[in-house]
Regions:
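Compact, glycine-rich, soluble single-domain proteins
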Residues: 2-4, 14-94, 105-106
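Helix-rich terminal scaffold detector
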Residues: 93-94, 99-113
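Short structural boundary motif marking the start of a folded domain
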Residues: 8-10
Length: 113
């Protein structure tokens, strides 16, 4: 068994950063569904802006809002306005074809790569 990329949201923009929240990344529910993420799932977040990487967990954001909010300590590492990739992984014994979600500058789903 190996950890393989299952899906990612590619080049999303962080719309908010809230250091006072208890932790996590808030993601628009539409993007959560299209990526196949589960609320509470561990994800890897990479900043294309700074190169920072961190692991956190997904929480539900308002559908069609475009919300991508870094919460808690993660908001010190990845800030509002940064371009990020959010990746989910799966433990599997055979190759899988990952879903790569494309979004526009308002984090609206535009298609799969």
């Amino acid at each position: 068994m190996r950890w393989l990329l299952r899906s990612k949201i590619f080049k999303a923009l962080v719309t908010e950063a809230d250091v006072n929240y208890k932790g996590s990344i808030t993601i628009d529910d539409e993007l959560i569904d299209k990526a196949g993420f589960l609320v509470g799932e561990k994800v890897l977040v990479v900043s294309n802006t700074t190169g920072a990487r961190l692991e956190t967990y997904v929480i539900s954001g308002k559908r069609h809002s475009g919300t991508i909010c870094m919460n808690g300590a993660a908001a010190h590492v990845i800030k509002k306005g940064e371009e990020i990739i959010v990746m989910g992984f799966e433990l599997a014994d055979t190759s899988i074809e990952p879903k790569i979600l494309l979004v526009d500058k308002q984090n609206r789903f535009t298609g799969y790569l």
